[in-house]
Amino acid sequence: MMRLVLDTNVLLSAPMSPASPSAEILSLWRDRKVTVLTAAEQIDEITRVTRYPRIRALLHPALAGRLVNRLRDVATVVENLPIVDRSPDPDDNYLLAIAERGEAQFPVTGDEPPLGLERHKSTRIVTPAVLLQLLKDGGK
C-alpha cells in the first residue's frame, strides 16, 4: 500500500473543500487504499492551528477533533524522527523527517513549489493533484 505524508494544509483543506484533490486523498485513506504517516509534531500542529479563529470559522471544531482523532487512531504514527534541515520553511522540516523515517513514497503538500523542494532524498514531493494523477497512471 502506498505510504503518504500529508501536509497539514492538505489535511485541513480536505474537509473545507469536499470536491478538492485533498478531499479525494482523504477518501482514499478512509477506504484504506493508502497509508497515511504522521507524527506527534503534526498532531500537535493541527490541534493548535484548528484553534485559530479564522480556521474555526471554516472548519467546525467537532470536525477538526474527528480529524485529530483519526490521525491518532488510524494513521501510522512515526516516532524518533531524524533531524532534517532542508526545507526553505523550517516549520516543514518535520514533514520531511516523517517521510524519511516512515519510508513514505510521497509527501503531499498544497505548497507551490512543494515544500520549496522537488525531492527529499529519493522521495518525490508532490501536490494533491499530481498524486491523484500518479495513482491514475499506476503510481509511476
What are these model-derived regions, one by one?
Residues 8, 40-41, 110-112:
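Short secondary-structure boundary segments
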Residues 1-38:
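Short, well-structured N-terminal submotif of metal-dependent ribonuclease cores
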Residues 28, 98, 117:
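Hydrophobic/aromatic ligand-binding patch that stacks against planar heteroaromatic rings
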Residues 11-12, 43, 55, 114, ...:
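A generic structural signal for short hydrophobic patches within well-formed alpha-helices
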Residues 89, 102-106, 112-140:
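Acidic, PIN/NYN-like endoribonuclease modules and their adjacent C-terminal/linker elements
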Residues 73-107, 112:
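Active-site neighborhoods of divalent-metal-dependent phosphate/nucleic-acid chemistry enzymes
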Residues 21-22, 64, 91-92:
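Amphipathic coiled-coil/heptad-repeat helices and related helical stalk/stem segments
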